[in-house]
A protein has these predicted regions:
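Ser/Thr-glycine-rich phosphate-binding loops at phosphate-binding pockets of nucleotides
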Residues: 143, 147-148
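Cys-dependent protein tyrosine phosphatase-like superfamily
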Residues: 1-138, 151-243
Length: 243
């Protein structure tokens, strides 16, 4: 099980102020395949927080009870944020090569393929956090788009959220990317990254969805085949899908 406060081995624009998170949203209200919707106040996604950020007003509860930080250690060292004692931090570096720090333009389909092929067990392991963490759980990386997008897609599909809704949620990030670049500049990040790091191509998320949906047993089969516990998946589903 992923333990908190340790570094582990192994639709909808939130806010456009550089003083706060710009790619934050609550993933409640998303339609499921059986006609229900996901619960509010359970799962958030966002870009990386910065010290002295303003409190966001677009989510029902803040700070989150739990935080799943998917960034590499070098990213955390560069941009550190100390959460209140009431927020449990799970540091789970997903895939260091997905850090948006390169001037070389990435092919995001290839990047997402590499993540799912190279570290599928690390994607599947996030179910343990989601199943046991107190809500709301915030999942974030640097931009809240690539590593976060894959992780959130896995969690939502495991809860039977409609694939089109998962895709639309990923694409909604596009509206926040200019604000994200402005935020990075306002926070004094002296990096120049290729514009492709801030794109949200539909074919990239379609590739991810197809990988999960076409797997034997669907998204749940993909997760269990890569190490997720069925009991954890059931517990997660009971949290995100109100009875």
């Amino acid at each position: 099980m992923v333990e908190p406060n340790t570094r582990l081995e192994e639709p909808i624009v939130a806010t456009q102020s550089a003083a706060s998170l710009v790619n934050l949203r609550d993933l409640g209200g998303m339609p499921t395949t059986d006609g229900t919707t996901t619960a509010h106040g359970v799962l958030y996604r966002s870009d990386a927080p910065y010290p002295r950020d303003e409190t966001p007003s677009t989510v029902p509860v803040w700070p989150p009870a739990a935080v799943l930080d998917l960034r590499a250690q070098v990213e955390r060292d560069d941009v550190g944020h100390e959460w209140d004692q009431g927020s449990k931090l799970y540091h789970w570096p997903l895939y260091d090569r997905a850090a948006p720090i390169s001037r070389d333009a990435p092919n995001l389909v290839d990047l997402y393929r590499n993540i799912l092929e190279a570290v599928p067990h690390r994607v599947a392991a996030v179910v343990d956090v989601a199943a046991t963490a107190e809500a709301p759980l915030l999942v974030h990386c640097a931009a809240g788009k690539d590593r976060t997008g894959i992780t959130v897609a896995a969690l939502l599909l495991a809860a039977d959220v409609q694939p089109d809704a998962v895709m639309d949620d990923y694409l909604a990030t596009a509206a926040n990317m200019t604000a994200l670049r402005n935020r990075w500049e306002a926070k004094g990040r002296n990096i120049t990254v290729a514009e492709a790091w801030l794109l949200t191509p539909q074919d990239a998320i379609e590739f991810v969805l197809d990988e999960f949906l076409s797997w034997r047993g669907g998204p749940i089969g993909w997760l269990t085949d890569h190490g997720a516990r069925p009991a954890a998946i059931d517990a997660w589903r009971s949290q995100i899908r109100p009875s």
